[in-house]
């Protein structure tokens, strides 16, 4: 039976507002803000729930999946209805580049660990200019390695990072077509199919690239590369190849 009551906890300020005594099998608690797997406030909340024997509610944690301490894993094992929404915005080094500070291999290792402990997994992905030409690589990987996993898409509409402003439209169309061939595309994830369809339909209609926004993207990303000591071409060469369109 789906939960009929939602308790929303986007950040540390609202955790104390959760009425633990009222939590039951119909309740749902969702931790989104920050990184809940390392937040002391979330740890204290779970400990209080455990002390009151209130652990059978639906619990969702949105996480980058990088840091899972032994203490956290032992604590979360007491909550049988837990879903981890893992943020993955690309396959392998594409994800590590866009989500600087993450470690693809570690994240995948942790996803397998969480599944082995009986927790459910979903994937949260943001299509944007970084991954719109290669998103199929992530879809195909998840299809093969985590076939029962739902994906939630939140398309990036920011003009300078937009999934709808890549000048290499043929690469985008090809990637979207490959996404459509996966089982993940037909999963019950929120906006997965409709998100891919919207990107595909946009590019097959010969859109005109907003060059000013593309220039803004490269100016921003070049600053990031200088600060991080990275080079875009080493991670997403087709995006670096799009730079030439800024001088036309």
Specify the residue positions occupied by each region the protein language model found.
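Short, well-ordered amphipathic alpha-helices
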Residues: 14-16, 42-50, 107-112, 139-143
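Conserved alpha-helix/loop element of class I SAM-dependent methyltransferases that forms part
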Residues: 18-20
């Amino acid at each position: 039976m789906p939960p009929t009551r939602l308790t929303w906890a986007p950040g540390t300020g609202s955790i104390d507002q959760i009425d633990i005594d009222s939590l039951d099998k119909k309740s749902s608690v969702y931790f989104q803000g920050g990184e809940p797997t390392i937040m002391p406030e979330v740890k204290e909340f779970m400990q209080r729930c455990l002390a009151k024997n209130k652990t059978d509610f639906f619990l969702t944690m949105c996480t980058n999946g990088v840091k899972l301490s032994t203490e956290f894993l032992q604590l979360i094992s007491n909550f049988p209805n837990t879903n981890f929404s893992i943020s993955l915005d690309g396959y392998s080094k594409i994800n590590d580049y866009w989500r600087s500070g993450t470690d693809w291999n570690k994240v995948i290792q942790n996803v397998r660990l969480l599944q082995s402990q009986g927790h459910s997994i979903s994937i949260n992905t943001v299509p944007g200019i970084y991954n719109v030409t290669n998103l199929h690589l992530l879809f195909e990987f998840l299809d093969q390695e985590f076939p029962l996993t739902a994906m939630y898409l939140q398309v990036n509409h920011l003009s300078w990072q937009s999934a709808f402003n890549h000048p290499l439209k043929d690469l985008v169309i090809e990637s979207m077509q490959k996404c459509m061939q996966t089982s993940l595309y037909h999963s019950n994830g929120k906006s997965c199919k409709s998100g891919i369809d919207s990107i595909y339909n946009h590019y097959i209609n010969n859109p005109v690239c907003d060059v000013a926004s593309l220039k803004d993207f490269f100016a921003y990303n070049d600053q990031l590369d200088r600060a991080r000591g990275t080079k875009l071409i080493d991670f997403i060469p087709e995006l670096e190849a799009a730079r030439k369109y800024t001088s036309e």
